[in-house]
């Protein structure tokens, strides 16, 4: 339940300032989902909430990277991939669990862009 977790820890984030760049790295299974007795967090509501939390993080000047990590081949046009991109925007990355070096590559690209 990414959006719920992000909201719960938001006060711990350190916004950028003149002396500090801030980054938020998220590893995800792709879908925000949490069922409970009398409670359900998933689908479009969770997707919208997660996107809202990502935008709040980014409004603090924090650059975000979120990785959809899976052991199956990711089809960029799948509903899961489209959902993930809607939640995380330009910070959304699809990663094959068998090639986690992709994480360091994209992180380095972000750091060097500064």
PLM regions: where:
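Acidic, glycine-rich A-domain
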Residues: 1-114
């Amino acid at each position: 339940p990414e959006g719920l977790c992000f909201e719960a820890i938001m006060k711990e984030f350190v916004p950028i300032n003149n002396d500090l760049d801030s980054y938020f790295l998220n590893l995800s299974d792709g879908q925000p989902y949490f069922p409970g007795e009398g409670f359900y967090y998933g689908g479009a509501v969770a997707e919208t909430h997660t996107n809202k939390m990502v935008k709040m993080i980014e409004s603090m000047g924090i650059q975000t990277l979120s990785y959809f990590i899976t052991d199956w081949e990711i089809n960029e046009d799948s509903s899961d991939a489209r959902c993930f991109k809607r939640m995380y925007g330009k910070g959304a990355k699809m990663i094959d669990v068998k090639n986690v070096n992709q994480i360091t590559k994209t992180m380095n690209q972000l750091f060097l862009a500064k």
